[in-house]
Amino acid sequence: MGDSTKKAETAKDVGTSQEKREARPLPTAADFEGKDTSEDTDGRAADADGEMSLERRLDSLREFLRERRGAIRVTNPGLETGRPRLQLAENMRPDPTNPYNRPSIEALSRIKPIAISNNMATSEDMMRIYVNLEGLGVPTEHVQQVVIQAVLFCKDASSSVFLDPRGSFEWPRGAITADAVLAVLKKDAETLRRVCRLYAPVTWNHMLTHNAPPAEWAAMGFQYEDRFAPFDCFDYVENTAAVQPLEGLIRRPTPREKVAHNTHKDIALRGANRNQVFSSLNAEVTGGMNGPELTRDYVKSNRK
């Protein structure tokens, strides 16, 4: 009896559960549409983010390549000017009050070099010359032109203290005798040659520009290739204390020109100084004659 009752209850429960399962509604297409839409939205957002990231990278690459392109590439950089100043350690800092202070290269670089030559006219000498030429009637704006004409005149004639000039130096609507100008140069610069040395680079460029060597080059025994060398101040062409042309030297003197100039200079000086052997030029000493010719022995020179 009890077993049959249990079986009946069990069968009833099974039937009830089957009815419940059979009563549950089936899912429709609408149930899946919302889920698929959210998943598609997430996928499209991820794709869009990836595309934007790729575009940003491409834009960055484009800008990078644009910055690197160009027709100019600086090579062999060796910049020193404008570099950051070094900070020395405390025990290495200079003491300018001590005469045995060791200056550093950095300190030496701050002392600007000034080219000085005692063998040419100074700035004070030239100022005296300019003022005196103005006083003689040369317009201020033409004083340098007159001085350069005088220097070029000496290139052809001579810069000797014994030079007796001829002619005049001109400017627009005016002129002054060469005697007056050279007298001022000799007086205010002590010697005419000191002024000519100051303008030696200018004279050199003028000769090369006009192909105008010293007029007496052939008579002085120079060869055609060395025709620009025979002027008194040739050895000051490369002197940095002299007045420099605006663009610099057209070319430097050649070694051959230097040899030719120095050879002629040696001969000329020995000829001019033959009386220097006398301690006095009185007739009792000289006998009324010039001194002996000064000779130089070139036998020991290397001429092989």
Curated annotation (Swiss-Prot):
InterPro entries: Carlavirus_coat_N (IPR013569), Pltvir_coat (IPR000052). The keyword Ribonucleoprotein applies. The keyword Transferase does not apply. Signal peptide: none annotated. Its main location: virion. It comes from the Viruses. Keywords: Capsid protein, Helical capsid protein, Ribonucleoprotein, Virion. It is found in: Virion. Residues 1-24, 32-54 have a biased composition (Basic and acidic residues). One of its GO terms (cellular component) is ribonucleoprotein complex. Residues 1-54 are annotated as: Disordered. GO terms for molecular function: structural molecule activity. The N- and the C-terminus of this capsid protein may be exposed on the surface of the virus particle. The central core sequence may be important in maintaining correct tertiary structure of the capsid protein and/or play a role in interacting with the viral RNA. Required for genome encapsidation. Forms ribonucleoprotein complexes along with TGB1 helicase and viral RNA. Belongs to the potexviruses coat protein family. This is Capsid protein. It comes from Potato virus M (strain German). The lineage of its organism: Viruses, Riboviria, Orthornavirae, Kitrinoviricota, Alsuviricetes.
